[in-house]
């Protein structure tokens, strides 16, 4: 049995479901809070992805949320397949006339191949033991040389953040540990940007799948 085939431990599954439940209750408030225009850091990262993917090629977005990043990528000529595990976000996008499919990257297979994948502000909600399987799954879904844009919270702590809508799992990574996992999955970092967010330090990485 490979890491991709291994079932998710019950504790990990419960932690993820607890986090998703929080987002189910706050999707509209979250959409309003983050705003429809990407932050300067986010816009720069999305442009890096667009530059790495030929116009008209398909990009998979994992954790599309309200869909603002996908909207921005589409203005750059990128075709985006939006996905999210949270029904409230999918419903929000449907009301905007956007199709967002259900995908739980922790347990679901990814159908098809893509020239790019974007997964921003998602990985911090996954347990440490889940990262290898997720990265392996993303690598399999990318064409050789394809681009992966993702972000993670820097540090080495694991904690819960508690809000009015629920509890959110946060797992942070050191740069060295995260890059080692990327390399193990067959990715080579090509661009990065580190910045201080509202509550946590973040790093955004654009990595290429080795041919």
Predicted regions and their residues:
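A conserved beta-strand element that flanks and buttresses the S-adenosyl-L-methionine
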Residues: 118
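Conserved acidic residues
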Residues: 115
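Short catalytic micro-motifs in class I SAM-dependent methyltransferases
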Residues: 121-125
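Class I (Rossmann-like) S-adenosyl-L-methionine-dependent methyltransferase catalytic domain
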Residues: 1-112, 130-133, 137, 147-211
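Helix-to-beta-strand junctions that scaffold the AdoMet/dcAdoMet cofactor pocket
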Residues: 126-128, 142-143
């Amino acid at each position: 049995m490979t890491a991709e085939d291994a079932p998710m431990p019950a504790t990990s599954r419960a932690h993820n479901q607890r986090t998703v439940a929080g987002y189910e209750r706050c999707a509209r408030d979250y959409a309003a809070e983050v705003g429809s225009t990407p932050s300067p850091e986010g816009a720069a990262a999305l442009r890096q992805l667009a530059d790495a993917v030929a116009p008209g090629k398909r990009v998979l977005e994992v954790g599309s949320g309200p869909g603002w990043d996908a909207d921005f990528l589409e203005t750059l000529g990128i075709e985006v397949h939006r996905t999210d595990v949270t029904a409230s976000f999918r419903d929000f996008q449907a009301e905007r006339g956007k199709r967002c499919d259900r995908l739980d990257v922790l347990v679901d297979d990814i159908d098809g191949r893509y020239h790019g994948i974007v997964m921003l502000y998602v990985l911090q909600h996954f347990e440490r033991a889940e990262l290898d399987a997720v990265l392996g799954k993303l690598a399999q879904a990318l064409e050789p040389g394809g681009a992966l844009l993702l972000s993670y919270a820097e540090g080495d702590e694991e904690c819960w953040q508690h809000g009015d809508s629920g509890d959110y799992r946060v797992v942070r990574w050191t740069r060295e540990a995260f890059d080692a996992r990327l390399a193990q999955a067959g990715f080579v970092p090509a661009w990065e940007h580190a910045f201080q967010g509202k509550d946590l330090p973040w790093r955004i990485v654009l990595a290429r799948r080795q041919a």
